[in-house]
A protein has these predicted regions:
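Helix-breaking motifs and short loop linkers at transmembrane-helix boundaries and internal kinks
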Residues: 17, 32-33, 56, 64-65, ...
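Conserved MFS/SLC helix-loop-helix module at the cytosolic interface between two early adjacent transmembrane helices
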Residues: 51-91
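C-terminal transmembrane bundle
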Residues: 15, 44-47, 69, 82-85, ...
């Protein structure tokens, strides 16, 4: 539970630091005497760096340990937040937002690497679901927190002071209690790390100290640092086509958050910043619920599919490899449908200024779908590359942030050309197309597995899926 709590807290600041900025955009535009389109560039730049940075930092975590990289990420984030709270020029704000994103962005991918260290495929979905749910709570509720801070202190600087204080408390807690989980350093949790920065106070407690037996046979062999490792995974045909719909779902959610902060303050709603913030609250709660539910569903459907596979091929000498890809991606059907429905309703209701209830309900559908997709795809990527869990999930982070940056950058022009209803209908149409790509990948993988039958264990081979023994000693 301690591990889940720490990873959730660290990830919360990563997801919250983007939407917490949205309610401040009108205030910042006036303060820096610029235009909304220019101010929006700081949002785009943040998302770009949030997507690119993990491909480097997460790779470091896979090779040199999770704990040191996480602590360094939080420290960089805190320094950037303090600096932003003191800046008085726009260009410096934009640059520091990039530093902020590069600092905290990798922790989401590194958290997934931890899941690969401590969980088996059978229970990985539940672990990822809980952690991702609390982490994505920041994406859903960040706007409300930002609005409340501006309303209370009447200053956009309060947002970054709040982030610095919250992340600072998390850094202290993580320094003392975050354990190292990399199997290249601690094996199955029975080995004391060599370096001080990799040691947490937990290993000196009697409950955990008695588990230390220095079983070096559980250590994984060190590998050379490969800067291109995440990109090699990213550009695999199966992975790339799978990430496309997940990235678009997140981008659609980001665009939704932007439109809420922009259009609810205008006629005919005329909401205050605080009232707009409350509109974000249901999304945050729905993210948490959806991620936990999808995590439990992933675990259940994995066990169901594996039992069905074992029953079917119990007496067979030659059998296809277990299709874990299909077991993970099948659960995305319902979230995909909810996203399409939510986007169409949200766009046209906001376009025709319908009752706020319709906007809230549709935004909940969008948030639930996006968070469910992220949890399912994170689990799938760790299943496929458990020894490079951070690097593999940084691919999802790269895809979703780059797509979010793209659509945030062109959003104003899209709305000017097609209107709100047309813009979100187009997004729904793109979701349908990319969801069909995912269906194609599932069918293609299933066909390939049937055509390449072999004597195997009920998991895929090492270059596709590597089942990792459960590391119970690392889960306080």
């Amino acid at each position: 539970m301690v591990l889940i709590l720490i990873l959730s807290l660290v990830g919360f600041w990563s997801t919250a630091s983007s939407p917490i900025y949205f309610p401040a955009l009108p205030t910042l535009t006036a303060y820096f005497h610029t235009t909304p389109s220019v101010m929006n560039l700081s949002v785009v730049a943040y998302l770009v760096f949030q997507g690119i940075a993990p491909t480097v930092s997460s790779n470091l975590a896979d090779n040199f340990g999770r704990r040191p990289v996480i602590l360094a990420c939080i420290l960089i984030f805190i320094a950037a937040c303090i600096a932003i709270s003191r800046t008085n020029v726009y260009w410096l704000l934009a640059v520091l937002r990039c530093v902020q994103a590069a600092g905290i962005g990798p922790v989401i991918a590194i958290s997934s690497g931890v899941a690969g260290d401590v969980c088996t495929s059978a229970d990985r979905g539940g672990f990822v679901g809980i952690v991702a749910g609390i982490q994505l709570l920041g994406n859903g509720m960040g706007g409300m927190v930002g609005a409340a801070l501006i309303n209370q202190f009447n200053s956009w600087r309060a947002i970054f002071i709040f982030l610095a204080i919250g992340a600072g408390a998390t850094l202290i807690f993580s320094f003392f209690f975050l354990p190292e989980t990399s199997r290249r350093i601690v094996g199955n949790g029975s080995i004391v790390p060599k370096h001080f920065i990799s040691k947490s106070a937990l290993i000196y407690l009697p409950h955990f100290k008695k588990r230390i037996n220095n079983d070096t046979t559980t250590l994984e062999p060190p590998t050379s640092f490969d800067f291109l490792s995440p990109f090699k995974i990213f550009f695999k045909k199966t992975v790339f086509l799978t990430l496309l719909p997940g990235g678009l779902h997140f981008a659609a959610w980001t665009v939704t958050l932007t439109c809420i902060s922009t259009y609810l303050e205008q006629e005919p709603y005329n909401y205050t910043v605080l009232q707009v913030g409350f509109v974000y609250l249901p999304q945050g709660l729905s993210c948490l619920v959806a991620s936990i539910l999808i995590g439990r569903t992933l675990n259940w459907y994995y066990r169901y599919s594996l039992k069905k596979y074992n029953d079917k091929y119990q007496d067979a000498l030659l059998k296809p490899r277990f299709n874990i890809f299909r077991a993970r991606m099948t659960v995305c059907i319902v979230p995909a449908v909810l996203m399409i429905i939510g986007l169409v309703i949200f766009g046209w209701c906001l376009h025709y200024h319908q009752h706020i209830a319709s906007i809230i309900v549709s935004s909940i559908l969008i948030a639930m779908s996006s968070s469910s997709f992220i949890a399912a795809m994170t689990t799938m990527l760790v299943d496929m590359h458990p020894n490079n869990g951070s690097a593999s999930t940084s691919c999802l982070n790269l895809m979703r942030c780059l797509q979010a940056a793209l659509f945030s950058g062109v959003l104003e022009n899209m709305i000017a050309s097609m209107g709100l209803g047309g813009t979100f209908t187009l997004l729904a149409g793109l979701c349908i197309v990319l969801d069909l790509c995912l269906v194609y990948v599932v069918i293609s993988v299933s066909k390939n597995l049937r055509e390449t039958s072999a004597l195997t264990t009920p998991v895929e081979s090492d270059n596709e899926v590597d089942e990792v023994p459960e590391q119970k000693s690392l889960q306080p």
